[in-house]
Amino acid sequence: MSIMKKTISALLICLMMAGINAQQISESTENVPENTKTTPLQYAELIQTDDALFRVVHFLCLQTTSVCLADKEPATRAEAAIYLNAIKTEKLDATGQRLYEQAHRYLHKQNYLLKNDYLTFDINGEFALYGQYSDAKKMLLADQLSHYNKTPAPVAVPLTINLSPYVNLATYLEIKKGFWASQLSLPFTNMPLKMEALDVHIPHVANISIANSFMSFTIGRGRHNIGQTLNGSLFLANSTHSLDFASLRFFHKSVNIASSIYIMERYRYLFTHEVHFKITDYVGVRLFEGTTQYGSFDLRYLNPMMVIHNIYGWDEGKVNGLTPNGSQFGIGLEVVPYRGLRFYGQFEMNQFQTAYERKNYPAESALIPNSLGGLCGIEYAHSFPACTLTFQSEFLYANPWLNILENKKISLLDKHTEKVKPQNTPDEYAAWLTNPIGPDTIAFTSKIGVDSFFRYGASLQYRFLVQGENGEKFFASSGDIYYPTTPDEASIKTPSGNPLFVHTLSIEGFDEVYKNLTLRAGFEVSVFTGRKKQTAFHTYAGIEYKIR
C-alpha cells in the first residue's frame, strides 16, 4: 500500500509540474473566440457523461468532415478543449460558428462564486419535480436503467473546488429515489416520499482530478460511456449510474490514449487500455483491450503498453475455486466521407477458439463458446439557422455468450447493493458494462431528432429487437457459474431458445423556457411478442430549475 501511495504522489507532482510548464490551451488563440481568450481554463474540472458539450463537439466534427475523438465520457475541460480547438472553423456554417462560440464560453466557465489565481469555488442548487408512470417490471433491464439514469433528483447540490487550474475536487450531492423505489414509482413522482424509497448511497458522482494541457489523472465515481451509438457502447456503456474508477489519459488533436481501472464491486475489477486515433481527418480507429479480475489488485494490468492477454492471468491458479481473469477486446472504426455523414462500427470479443485450438485441444475448446458481438450504423446531421436535424440508424448483433465468462465474478457485469429499499425487492441489481441490451440479441434502431443543444431538443426513436433466452437464464441461475457444460450449449446461436420480439417507440423533448428553467417530457411504449405477450408504458413530464 505504501508503494501505491508513493506512486500516486509522484504522479501528482509530475502532473503539477508539467501543467505549470506546459503552454496553456487557452493561451493558444488560434480558433478561439475573442470573448474567451482572456478567461483561464480550469484544466482538471470534469465534464460529466451525457453533457450537451459532447454532442456539440460531435456535431461540429461532422460538419467539418472530421472524426470526433471527444467521445470518451466523462472528460476534463482540458481534453475537451484540445478537440474543440482542433476544429477547422473555416468549414463551419453560421449555425456551426454560433455553436462553436457557445461551446467555448461553456468550457471557459466564469460565474464561480469565488475566483482568484489559485482557487475557485462553486456551489449550486438544482431542483426537479417530475410526474411519471412506468411498467418497469415488464420492461427490458436496459430500459429500466436508462429511465432511472435520466430521471433527475428533486434536490441536488453540485460542488466543485479548483486548487489552481490543475487540480479539481468535485461532488454531486442529491436527495433522490433508489433504483428499486423508482421501479415502483412510489407514488408516481421522482420524489422519495417514504424512507424506504430514499437512495442512501450518494454521492454517485465524485472525483479528484489533476490535468494539464496534454494529460489527466482522475480518481472518482460516476457514469461512463465510450463512443456515440444508439444501442449502447460495446466498449463501455453508460447503463450503470455509479462506477468507481481511476483513469490516466493522454490527449492530442489526433490521438487519445487511456489506461483505466473500474471497480464493479469489492474484489472485482475491470482493467482497460485503449488508443483512439485518426488515420486521416475523416477516418478514425479505436483499439481497446481489457481484462476482468477477481481477487487481489494486480498492478501488472495498469501498464498501458502491455498486451493484457499475454499476461495469461486466467492460467495462474484459481481464487476461491474460480477462474480469476476474463478478457475483453474491441475494435472501433469511424468514417466521415462527406459533410455531416458518418459511418461507424464497433466489435467486441471475449473468447474465440481458433482452428489451432480446436485441432490441438478439441475437448477443452468444444466447451468454450465464441463470445462476440458487433454493431454498425450510419448518421447524418444537417444544420438549420435555429437548430440541427439528425438521422441515425444502427444494427446490433450479440451472440448468446457475449460478456458471459467462466464465472459471474469475471463476467462484464456491474452490481449495486441497496441498503434501504422497498419491501419484497431484491438486495441488489446488475447492469451490463457493455452492450446494455444484453447478450443473445439482434436489434435495429432508428432515430430522428432536432437539437439546439443548449436550449431545446426533441427526438423520435424506433427499435426492433429479437432476444433469446440466454441472458435471462444467466440472471436466473444460482451460484457463481453459468457456463456451457456440453458442446451443444457452447454452440447455441442467436436468438437461442424461445425468442422474444420487442417493438419500442419513444418520443422525448425539452425546452429551456426561461433562463435556468427547463421543461421535459417523454413517452415510450414497448410491445412484446414471442415468449412474452405484453405491453409496457413509460411516460414522464417535469420541470427543472437551477439557481445559477
Question: How would you name each of these model-derived features?
Answer:
Residues L69-A70, A142-Y148, P158, L193-A197, ...:
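Outer-membrane beta-barrel domain signature
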Residues M1-D50, R55-V57, L69, P74-R105, ...:
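Cleavable N-terminal export/targeting peptides
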Residues F214-S216, N225, L236, T240-P426, ...:
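Signature for the C-terminal beta-barrel architecture of outer-membrane proteins
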Residues L119-G125, L169-T171, S182, M215-F217, ...:
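Transmembrane beta-strands of outer-membrane beta-barrel proteins
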Residues V275, Q534-R548:
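Outer-membrane beta-barrel "beta-signal"
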Residues I25-K37, I47-T49, L53, R105-V155, ...:
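Transmembrane beta-strand segments of Gram-negative outer membrane beta-barrel proteins
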Residues N149-T151, L169-A206, Q228-G232, A355-L367:
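Surface-exposed loop and membrane-interface regions of Gram-negative outer-membrane beta-barrel proteins
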